[in-house]
Amino acid sequence: MSDTTDSTSRFRLGDDIHFSYDNQSQPTTSESPAPSSSNKKKKKKANKKHKQPVEATLNNPEDDYPTSRVIKQAPNGDVIVESLDDEASHQNQENHRHHHQYTNIWDSASIEEQENLKSFWESLDESSKMELVKIDKKSIMEIFKNETKANNQSHHGHGANGTSSASGANSAANANPVTPSCACKYCGRRSTIIEDELENIYDNHFDDIIDFIHEIRDINDLNALPGLLFGGFHMLEEEHKLQKRQQRMKHKRDHPASQNHTENPEVHGEHPHVQPQNFVNSRAPADSINTSVVDNRTPYPVAAGSIGAKQLQHQQQLQQQLQQQQLRQLQQQLQQEQNVHSQPQQSLQMQQQLNENDLPGGNTSDLAKHLEKMSLEDKKGEYTNERKIFQKLLDPKLVEVLDKVDFEKVKSGNYVGSASQANLFQRADCLREIVRDLHKADKTQLEQGLSFLKNISSIFSNSKTPFPADVTSNPRNFSSKFNDQLSNFAEDLLKNDGNSFIEMMESLSESRTAREDLLKDPTKKDAQAWVDEDDNNDSKRPDASTVKQPSQEYEYYEESEEDEEELSEEDEDDADDNGLNEDDDLVQDGHHDDSASDTESEISEEEKMQEIRRLFLIQVIKLFQERLKSAYKEKLSEDRTQKLIEELEAEENAKKERELKKLKQKEKAKEKKRLQQLAKEEEKKKKEEEQRAKEEELKQKQEALKADQRRRKEEAKLKREEEKKKRIEELKRKEEEHKKKVEAQQKKEEEAKKLKEERKKKAEEERKKKEEEKRQKELLKKQKEEERERLKLEAEENERLEKEQQELQELQESQNQLELESAQLPAELAEEINASPDSFSPTKNHLLEQLYQARPSSVSGPTTISPPIQFTPEAVPPVAAVSSVVPSVVPISPALSGAILNGTGSPNSRNAMLYGSSAQAQLPNGLNSSTSNMSPWSSKSRLNSTSGASLQSNLFQPQLSASGFSPFNDFSTPATSAGIGSVNVNAPLASTAVEPLAGANNGGVWNPSTTSSRNNSIWSNTPNLNNASIWGNTLPSLAGGAGAGASTPSAAHTLPNSAPLASDNELIQVAAYNTFQMLQNSNQLEFGAAPLMKLFSGVKLLLGNNALTINQLLSSCDSTSVYHFEFVYDDFGTVTHVKVNFNNGGLAQSLQSQAAPTLLNNTLATSAAGLRSSPPPGLGTKASTGSVPLSQFRFNINDANSPLLSNLGDWSSGNNSTNANGNSSNGGSRGLWN
């Protein structure tokens, strides 16, 4: 192999990468090209001995790995990084492969680092410290297993050197130095035996192990733990090493020839595992073992002159030797147990073989010396055993052991051989009490206890099973010695009342102190840096008899039974692994000689337990060391990470500051540009503003001109409006003056009427007192409700009355003028009639003739006049026949009849019914006014004048129904869809289509411009007025009083011969009959029935009472009399038409039977037109209607207290009201009256 630099690199599971360099060159050989594997290994071993550790230096510290490398995985799972062109590195790597397993921070750390670890331990809190010192089974087992693997690999490497002359198969099998384990039967059997023994030890002596750990150093004292970790157990190693050295020195002085047998290790056996008696031949010299141990245990090369390095190497050697000795003793014990159970004499044979091997030539003198030496040591051992018996007797755990012993099973087993032994076990409870109170016991109790122990020892010595607490090579000799010791102990205890016992305890304490001082001296000489202040207190510790009770010692370990079981398993496994390691070291070191069996017999049970305790203590301390190391590494890693983070943050902050500076500079540049741009924009804005200012000035001038023009127009408009307002105010003022005059005149008239009415009331009060009393009670209840409605209607009616009175006043004035102008017309007509009395034809209707002649042409409207209806003389029955039936009928004056026929008497029946106050003003003066009665038949009528045309058309124009509904569809015009409550007036009276004579081109009285004589009548002759008139009395002469303004006779004056009527109902019936007759004569009937509104208007005109309501008319017509009234209803149950007949002995003679068509009679008989002949439900009947005197209706229409005032709007209002007669009217949309 060429001379190359031995450079190996290693990377292990997250640890740092370590490089080691060796500058020594390996000499090349020119021997055979294929040397044996044993020679190579010997050369490597020699090289290892001469190799000296040097300080590590890195050629390229910045490189993480070599440039040419191979990454491999070791058998234990480690990752290995090697160079490609270095073949020797692989072999050197095998020697250093497991150096991390033996590395701990205290072996390689300097004093400064140890101080850092101590300060780190002190900085931890209580919980972290408790977590670090907690015994973990898994962790301890891992430590044992790692050491076992390392020792196995090292053991197989040395075994290959010792068996180089074996067969070819064995040589090939051992050629691989890195074999992790052996597959032979003996290795497996040995491992199994060791595991079982460790389990036994752990199960039976776990408390002793823990006691020992606490005895060395109180683990619960967390502040003292660094002293334990940094040197507490090394003191134990020094003590053990000193004892072993003394024994070896004595053994070498006594047997110097035994060293010669170690030079030929290849004489006996083919395999180191097959022959256990020859395993001592394969050991290496002690110096070479120590050298290899130091080499393997030094992971990092340190400086040559360093005090810490020397101390660490020294501690490593002590630790390795201690472990190897413990494992050798454990293996010897196992072999002794196997020999005892299988062949009791095997141990003697083995001792003989060992003596033969160690003493060739049969040197009996040396053997005799050796036996004498052993006898002396046995005597010393007896003395030490006596002391141990005291300690055992005073041990507080003896009580627990006795409590756990099941004496019943012992009785049933082979231990009990006689009745005395059975009785002995029966007194076990007494023994327990004696042991518990041993410190307070007297001599008798101590004698009983000692005698009991002697008997127990005799039982176990005679039995097949040895005493479990003391297992030696010769149990029978031990039992005899034990009996002797007990006897001596009893004798010493009984002497001087126990003073000898106290002296013995003091001597034990002094010997322990001297031993501790002896151990401390060489440590201080070698290295003072490792002296711990806690070790000075070891001399003050009490003896085993004064050790704390278990309840105080094991506070940390008494959490639960499960924890103790886990801990026992951990320590068991640890002891198992460590036993394997020590066994391997035993084979490597070859520390046995021919006197091994004699030395083993000297080792007592307590010493073996001491070794086991130390072994577990070492493992526990290793566990604590690794935990503290890992915690410290984590802390360092966190600190470095935090520092790195801080550095990164600082760098990031610096970077951000630089960026901020750049941004600020950019912002400044941008701000400068922005300011320049703003300056340019401001200049531009100034120019634009100047231009805008000029444009605004022009606009303002234009607007000023426009505003001036508008102002002028507004001023002109305001002037016109002011003038118009002035004109309107003047008109209003004139109207107000006119209204005042009219109101004054009306007040006078009302006062006069009130006086008349009061007189009438006084006359009638006595007669109607009883009736009124009854009615008053009912009226009082209803008046309260009427009062409310009256107040509402009064305000509205007052406004309407003012307007209508004004209009009526103007109309009256115009009528008065017309009457004055046509005052001479009746005189002329009378003269004509008187002049030709013989020419009167009885078949002619003189009344109609007079009415037709007297009709003023000014009343006719612009509408087209229908052609005249030709009446035959037979169409009208004789008046005498009528007068014979009708008792005394009020005659109707020509003016009144003309007014009725032409519509002047009732211009609008609907308005007449709605506004009762205006109806009085619309009547002719002869019926309603006390002023001078002017004749309306003057040809110089002012009704045709332009000024009064609009007023006349508004007053006399018929008001049609809004709904346009009519059962006959003759005179109605559909206009709008109004409610049902709007009545179809059908206004035939107000219509000009029913004029009897209407020829536009014909001359006559209807044409105001005609020049024909008034004597020409429609019948071509003039009736003789000298005869009796149709009214049965002579008309008064009107010629003489025409100019003087004589008033026309009123209705009261036209009935001088008439007797008073029986009741008011009869008066209303007579008026209704006369009105029906006039409508029949004027051909205004509709299918033989008179429209209700026309009939109602005529009745009010005849009676001169505008306060009369439709309900009163219908109730009066429904009462029994000589007249028979038939009502015709529409689909809504409203009365629309009335038919009047006579009730003459059951024979009804219709006044219109000859004039009505036959089709009408058939239609009325069969009700084909949908008319009803019977009243619908809800109409007033005879039973519900009382007779009301006529005087009840003669009230002033302007009187607010009139009981009939509320009945004026019954048919048009929708409110429930009650009239003066007690008739209820709900005002619904179904009918005009109910």
UniProtKB/Swiss-Prot annotation:
Residues 161-175, 929-941, 1214-1227 have a biased composition (Low complexity). The keyword Transmembrane does not apply. Residues 1-70, 149-175, 246-283, 513-608, 661-816, 924-945, 1214-1234 are annotated as: Disordered. May act as a negative regulator of salt tolerance. One of its GO terms (cellular component) is cytoplasm. This is Stress response protein NST1. InterPro entries: NST1. Keywords: Coiled coil, Cytoplasm, Stress response. Residues 263-273, 513-527, 661-670, 679-806 have a biased composition (Basic and acidic residues). Residues 633-826 form a coiled coil. Its main location: cytoplasm. Belongs to the NST1 family. It is found in: Cytoplasm. Residues 555-587, 596-605 have a biased composition (Acidic residues). Residues 1-10, 21-31 have a biased composition (Polar residues). Residues 39-51 have a biased composition (Basic residues).
